[in-house]
Amino acid sequence: MAVFTFEDQTTSPVAPATLYKALVKDADTIVPKAVDSFKSVEIVEGNGGPGTIKKISFVEDGETKFVLHKIEEIDEANLGYSYSIVGGAALPDTAEKISIDSKLSDGPNGGSVVKLSIKYHSKGDAPPNEDELKAGKAKSDALFKVIEAYLLANP
């Protein structure tokens, strides 16, 4: 298995503590409200802390799909959160898992800076498919913007 690491950063007008609360602490209720295509978030294993696996169900192209999301680490004091995609529609056949480490910090005008480190754990040594990476990033960015808009409209 090879591991390929990608770094990303974005800004948001939403304050770090508010964004963290919505994306980590209250995500199971906020995300289905904010994102029409998301139908449910259910815990399939664990108690909500590290090691917990969540099944996130959503509709894409008229078909119900799911993602298995495993919580790796919660660092509320430093606004950090780590999780892995371990199964379902968002995990390409070429990957064993995709791990995401996120960290929020103060940004311009009371907003946030979001730093991401994405680790693609491939099956074998083959690098990830560039088109799959671009499509995944586009979906992730769009999802983030929808949640951000929801938070701005519902302070």
Curated annotation (Swiss-Prot):
It comes from the Eukaryota. PROSITE patterns: PATHOGENESIS_BETVI. The keyword Magnesium does not apply. Gene3D superfamilies: 3.30.530.20. Induction: By fungal elicitor. Signal peptide: none annotated. It holds the Pfam family Bet_v_1. One of its GO terms (cellular component) is nucleus. GO terms for molecular function: abscisic acid binding; protein phosphatase inhibitor activity; signaling receptor activity. Keywords: Pathogenesis-related protein, Plant defense. GO terms for biological process: abscisic acid-activated signaling pathway; defense response. Belongs to the BetVI family. PANTHER family: OS08G0374000 PROTEIN-RELATED, STRESS-INDUCED PROTEIN SAM22. This is Pathogenesis-related protein 2. It comes from Phaseolus vulgaris.
